[in-house]
Structures are given as structure tokens and as C-alpha cells.
């Protein structure tokens, strides 16, 4: 993850490419027909700026610390005066009454408050004059199923060059808003998903899987129609 060691990434790509070739050759030597898929769930990118998201929430009036403190962590937050908080690298939660232990945001406030925070964050520019955010989505726009309710109220998609700080991930509230990243950890995938798409390689025709996702893996890998490339993916899994 070192900023100045891109040669390491290239070397590993070469090793992995050789490994894939070796596996493919061994399977081919077994004889008969075979299929293989190589997928990743995300890509990778560098980031130069660390975002302290709870500091932004504090400066914009959504989060208040106890006793006039200028920095702290989750235990330092005055929950009776806090409407939103960040914990995790890409998450904002509202302090919802009846859900959080000391929630104050009523049901009728949730939708307009989320829209307000979303709009303000999308208008936030960093030191380079560019937007800090690439995209911000509501939980139901990202997740589906029985556990959607457990997801963050806003899913934060940082723009290229920006990423949440480790302090944000732990729910801390530092004094700074944005900090230059001089850490050895200089790259990962914790930005907007469109910035770091995954990849798929296959030795079969995937023309009917234009928007292929991980939900298609069982259908592609273990079904009785494995060799029938004309079969379309299921509409719902």
C-alpha cells in the first residue's frame, strides 16, 4: 500500500496471472469441458486526503460534544443534542428516537433530515476545489432484503483522492476536518463503488450477463445449465 511502490502491485499482478495460467492448464489437462470464473468484489485506488466525517457533522450542527469539548469519541457525544453521527468508513446514522438508545430524531424528521445532510455533503469541496463526495445514497438504494434496516441511513461514496479517516471508522471526533494522508496505508477500496469496480474474467460467453453481479455466481458456477451460455440470468435471487 506504499504510495511510492507501484512496482509491488505490478509484480503481484504478474504472479497472479501466472497462477491463473497454471490452474487453467491443469484443469484443461483433465480433459473434457470446463468453465472458470475469476471475480473480484472491488478494485483499488490511492487516496491523498483523510476525511473526519464527525467533525463535519459537528461543524454543521448535527453533532454536539459534551461540555463544550472540541474533540472526543462516541462516549463524548451529547446525544440529547445530536441528530447524526458517523461510525464505520462509509456510514452516517441518524440518532433516531426509538432506535438509538438516546434518539431524538422523530419519524417525520428522518426523510427531510437525510435529504438536507445529503445535499450539504454533495456541495462540500476539498482543498483542491473538487467535490469530496462522488455519491451519497439512502440505505434502500444500496441494500435489499430482510436486513436492510440494519444498514447505515446514508451510504457515503467518497470521490477519488478522498477517504474516511480511521478515526471516523471508530466514531471519533478529531479537531481537524480534512487531513493529508501520509500513512503507509495509502490505498484501498473504501470510496464510491463506481470509482473502484471489480472485474470478471471467464472462459465462457457472458453476453447475457451485461450487469453481472455476485448474485449470479450460483447460477453461473453450479447450476445444471453451466455450459449453456444462451441461458439468461434470473431476474431475482
What is each stretch, according to the model?
Residues 2-14:
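The substrate-binding groove and active-site-proximal loops of carbohydrate-active enzymes
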Residues 1-3, 97-98:
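A short small-residue
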Residues 158-218:
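Low-complexity, glycine/alanine/valine/leucine- and proline-rich hydrophobic stretches
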Residues 11-18, 52, 216:
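A general alpha-helical scaffold signature found inside nucleotide-binding enzyme cores
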Residues 22, 27-171:
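Secreted, luminal/periplasmic, and some membrane-associated catalytic domains
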Residues 96-127, 204-206, 210-236:
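Non-catalytic, well-ordered alpha-helical segments in soluble enzyme domains
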Residues 4, 48-52, 212:
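Generic recognition of short, well-ordered alpha-helical segments
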Residues 19-29, 33, 41, 200-215, ...:
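A structural signal for the main folded, soluble domain(s) of proteins
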Amino acid at each position: 500500500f506504499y504510495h511510492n511502490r507501484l512496482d509491488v502491485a505490478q509484480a503481484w499482478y504478474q504472479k497472479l496471472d501466472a497462477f491463473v495460467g497454471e490452474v487453467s492448464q491443469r484443469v484443461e489437462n483433465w480433459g473434457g469441458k470446463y468453465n472458470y470464473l475469476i471475480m473480484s468484489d472491488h478494485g483499488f485506488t490511492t487516496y491523498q486526503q483523510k476525511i473526519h466525517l464527525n467533525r463535519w457533522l459537528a461543524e454543521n450542527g448535527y453533532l454536539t460534544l459534551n461540555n463544550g469539548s472540541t474533540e472526543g469519541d462516541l462516549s463524548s457525544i451529547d446525544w440529547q443534542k445530536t441528530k447524526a453521527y458517523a461510525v464505520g468508513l462509509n456510514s452516517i446514522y441518524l440518532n433516531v428516537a426509538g432506535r438509538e438508545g438516546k434518539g431524538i430524531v422523530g419519524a417525520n424528521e428522518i426523510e427531510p433530515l437525510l435529504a438536507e445532510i445529503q445535499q450539504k455533503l454533495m456541495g462540500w469541496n476539498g482543498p483542491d476545489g473538487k467535490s469530496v463526495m462522488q455519491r451519497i445514497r439512502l440505505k434502500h438504494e444500496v441494500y435489499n432484503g430482510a436486513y436492510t434496516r440494519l444498514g447505515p441511513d446514508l451510504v457515503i461514496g467518497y470521490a477519488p483522492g478522498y477517504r474516511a479517516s480511521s478515526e471516523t471508522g471508530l466514531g471519533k471526533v478529531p479537531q481537524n476536518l480534512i487531513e493529508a494522508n501520509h500513512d503507509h496505508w495509502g490505498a484501498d477500496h473504501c470510496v464510491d463503488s463506481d470509482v473502484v469496480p471489480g472485474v470478471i474474467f471467464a472462459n465462457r460467453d457472458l453476453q447475457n450477463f451485461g450487469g453481472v453481479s455476485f448474485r449470479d455466481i450460483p447460477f453461473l458456477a453450479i447450476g445444471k445449465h453451466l455450459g449453456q451460455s444462451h441461458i439468461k440470468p434470473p431476474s431475482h435471487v
